[in-house]
A protein has these predicted regions:
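Terminal helix-turn-helix DNA-binding modules in bacterial transcription factors
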Residues: 20-24, 28, 33, 37, ...
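Key DNA-contact positions within bacterial/archaeal DNA-binding proteins
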Residues: 48, 98
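Proline-centered helix-kink/hinge sites
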Residues: 62, 111-112
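An amphipathic alpha-helical interaction segment
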Residues: 1-10, 14, 18-24, 49-51
């Protein structure tokens, strides 16, 4: 949320308050099947108004932000949770593992399975602490 505030120059304006409320809604509900209409309704503005103020303040559409946030959370889970890719997909709001993999690849450049392999290789290459 702090990053969102820093990215928006007019945090005091009402449009920025709508965006902050939308971001908060996304962060609390990203794991559910939510749409831009749901976000707009939660914030109390029309879908088109939300789109305009989001683009103006964040530089991306609400759906792109939601997708980016979901993929970011998926990356954290891939790195830290030990959950399967299917479990991670569901936990970040994708109810079709194959669609999740396509979206993940579009955003990150590699499918989640290859991302996980890269994380494992990175962990193996990291220096191990010396036990006394």
């Amino acid at each position: 949320m702090k990053e969102a505030r820093e990215a928006m120059p007019n945090v005091g304006s009402s449009s920025s308050q709508y965006v902050l409320a939308a971001i908060k809604f996304i962060q609390f509900n990203y794991s559910h099947d939510i749409s831009v209409d749901d976000i707009a309704q939660a914030v109390g503005v029309s879908r088109s108004h939300l789109y305009r103020v989001f683009m103006s303040n964040v530089g991306q559409s609400p759906i792109d932000y939601l997708t980016s946030y979901r993929i970011s959370e998926a990356c954290s889970l891939l790195k830290n949770s030990g959950l399967s890719i299917a479990e991670i997909a569901v936990s970040v709001g994708f109810f079709d593992q194959f669609y999740f993999s396509r979206v993940f690849k579009k955003v990150k450049g590699v499918p989640p399975s290859k991302y996980l392999v890269a994380l494992e290789k990175e962990a193996q290459a990291a220096p191990q602490p010396i036990n006394p």
